[in-house]
């Protein structure tokens, strides 16, 4: 009888630990779902702004290539003022980082989920690399912006927000020197190229996030159902 009682005690304790681990696993999965949903929403905003940036860059190139800067000075200044401000994606990978450092990935019993999430997290490394490359190209472009554009016009365009307003009148650029303009366009080309690359990568990343989110919800329908309540 004593043996049975001891065995039963071990069984109850082990069962309790299983329940606790299962609850922790569900909490981790719910946290991952939150991270992915946040990423998807954030990427919606970033993608839209990147598409707008592409239009602005193409407009600048068209205006300057066709010698229309005197006709579209207001637009030129407005588009140029946004060049140093590419939309940045900040990945919400808090849960992934916490699990890597705590070793609690072991609580997730589904190995496919673990592999998928780790692969998703690896994409952030590439995103950060491209972000650094873009920052370098934008810094190079600053020198030409300072030569071509009147800082007092830019100052007029400031508002108490992260956005800008169109300048009044039809301001002119500082020079019509072709060498100066071509140098600006050359550097702008590289900024455009990295923006196109970023835009494509963000779209792929968002698609992957949606696929992973659906996969997790299929594998953990109870967690998904609980979140919908």
Region roles according to the model:
Residues 1-19:
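Membrane-embedded hydrophobic alpha-helical segments
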Residues 14-229:
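Long, hydrophobic alpha-helical segments that serve as membrane-spanning/inserting helices
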């Amino acid at each position: 009888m004593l043996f049975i009682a001891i065995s039963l005690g071990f069984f109850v304790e082990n069962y309790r630990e299983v329940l606790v681990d299962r609850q922790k696993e569900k909490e981790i999965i719910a946290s991952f779902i939150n991270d992915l949903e946040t990423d998807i929403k954030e990427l919606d905003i970033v993608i839209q702004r990147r598409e707008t940036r592409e239009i602005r860059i193409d407009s600048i190139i068209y205006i300057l290539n066709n010698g229309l800067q005197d006709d579209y000075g207001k637009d030129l200044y407005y588009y140029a003022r946004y060049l140093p401000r590419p939309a940045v994606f900040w990945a919400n990978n808090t849960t992934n980082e916490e699990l890597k450092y705590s070793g609690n990935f072991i609580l997730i019993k589904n190995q496919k989920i673990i592999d998928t999430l780790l692969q998703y997290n690896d994409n952030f490394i590439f995103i950060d690399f491209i972000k650094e490359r873009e920052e370098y190209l934008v810094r190079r472009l600053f020198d030409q912006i300072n030569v071509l554009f009147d800082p007092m016009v830019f100052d007029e365009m400031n508002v108490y927000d992260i956005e800008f307003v169109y300048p009044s009148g039809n301001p002119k650029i500082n020079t019509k020197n072709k060498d100066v303009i071509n140098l600006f366009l050359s550097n702008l080309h590289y900024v455009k190229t990295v923006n196109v690359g970023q835009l494509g990568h963000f779209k792929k990343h968002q698609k992957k996030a949606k696929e992973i989110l659906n996969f997790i919800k299929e594998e953990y329908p109870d967690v998904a159902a609980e979140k919908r309540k």
